[in-house]
């Protein structure tokens, strides 16, 4: 579960390393985001010469959460870290590579570009 002020890792090569959630998209007063949900983030640390800089505000999709996620078949999935992939204004990934596994729930939410770039879909 991701909420405002949550620090997250960035799972792509857009140049950002750590971001902080500043808003959860999807309705008035929505408090939590989980796998596949879109959030607004602020870049807290970035690599020099990257496409994004510190203090940049961007949209992102959550690809991994520490909090377990219950699937329709009754199984649970959880990861070791909270991670996002930064998106451009068209909703496509800003980076050209994705690091680490992503959940297959992204396929249901039509993030096919992220699924195709990911090294492993769990």
UniProtKB/Swiss-Prot annotation:
GO cellular component, as recorded: cytosolic large ribosomal subunit
Protein function: Binds to 23S rRNA. Forms part of two intersubunit bridges in the 70S ribosome.
Name of this protein: Large ribosomal subunit protein uL14
Organism from which the protein derives: Chloroherpeton thalassium (strain ATCC 35110 / GB-78)
Gene Ontology MF annotations: large ribosomal subunit rRNA binding; structural constituent of ribosome
Quaternary organization: Part of the 50S ribosomal subunit. Forms a cluster with proteins L3 and L19. In the 70S ribosome, L14 and L19 interact and together make contacts with the 16S rRNA in bridges B5 and B8.
Keyword Coiled coil on entry: no
InterPro entries tied to this protein: Ribosomal_uL14 (IPR000218), Ribosomal_uL14_bac-type (IPR005745), Ribosomal_uL14_CS (IPR019972), Ribosomal_uL14_sf (IPR036853)
PROSITE patterns given in the database record: RIBOSOMAL_L14
GO biological process, alphabetically ordered: translation
Family to which this protein belongs: Belongs to the universal ribosomal protein uL14 family.
Domain of life, per lineage: Bacteria
HAMAP family, alphabetized: Ribosomal_uL14
Sorted UniProt keywords: Ribonucleoprotein, Ribosomal protein, RNA-binding, rRNA-binding
């Amino acid at each position: 579960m991701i909420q405002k002020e949550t620090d997250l890792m960035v799972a792509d090569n857009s140049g950002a390393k750590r971001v902080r959630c500043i808003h959860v998209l999807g309705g008035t007063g929505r408090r939590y985001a989980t796998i596949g949900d879109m959030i607004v983030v602020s870049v807290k640390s970035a690599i020099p010469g990257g496409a994004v800089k510190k203090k940049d505000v961007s949209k992102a999709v959550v690809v991994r959460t520490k909090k377990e996620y219950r699937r329709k078949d009754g199984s649970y999935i959880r990861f070791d870290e909270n991670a996002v992939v930064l998106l451009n204004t068209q909703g496509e990934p800003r980076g050209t590579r994705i690091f680490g596994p992503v959940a297959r729930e992204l396929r249901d939410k039509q993030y096919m570009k992220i699924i195709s770039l990911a090294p492993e879909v769990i």
